[in-house]
């Protein structure tokens, strides 16, 4: 056991043991940063950090723009895009999304990307949540919005190398089939979880526990 760890008793109601270190003892401070690779989609840095206890290390950080996912709901159906993903060499069915311009309001990006990819213009936009795509590597965030009161403009504005099919499927079918071969994008799972919380799916079965900062009190 690390000397800073605190062993807590078993919680008989939820049945787990946790080794707890106060947040202030977990923090590392950045002391240096060096750009080692620039790409069209993100920059790679070598970042030097020092922990409170004196440990030091070099860590790789990917700096990318803010990302957007737009859940578009149209009369009980999700508006989805199906496209080729070059890294996985596979077709995926997912929610529309894109990249924010520097300083751009994420809600503006979410509405714009939806219209560009699907032709649907939203009447209302609701922010469902913001998450880190992978805090171990990426420094940016993913903003997730729900678009409703949709109007089909009949016009799309795809990038030169984009070739996208637009499909509409029942909400329940998409939720049921997530994590199948067709629905493999992890961001879609996060977006679905936030959507289900917003709509109140199964909230009566969720157990709420004490905030971690109150555990030692």
Regions found by a protein language model. Name each.
Residues 13-38:
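Extreme N-terminal tail/first-helix region
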Residues 32-69, 74:
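Acidic, metal-coordinating catalytic segment for phosphate/diphosphate chemistry
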Residues 57, 64-69, 74, 98-187, ...:
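Unchanged
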Residues 73-75, 80-82:
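Glycine/small-residue-rich phosphate/adenosyl-binding loop
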Residues 87-93:
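A conserved beta-turn-beta hairpin within the catalytic core of GNAT-like acetyltransferases
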Residues 190-208:
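Charged phosphate-binding loop/patch that engages nucleotide di/tri-phosphates or the phosphate backbone
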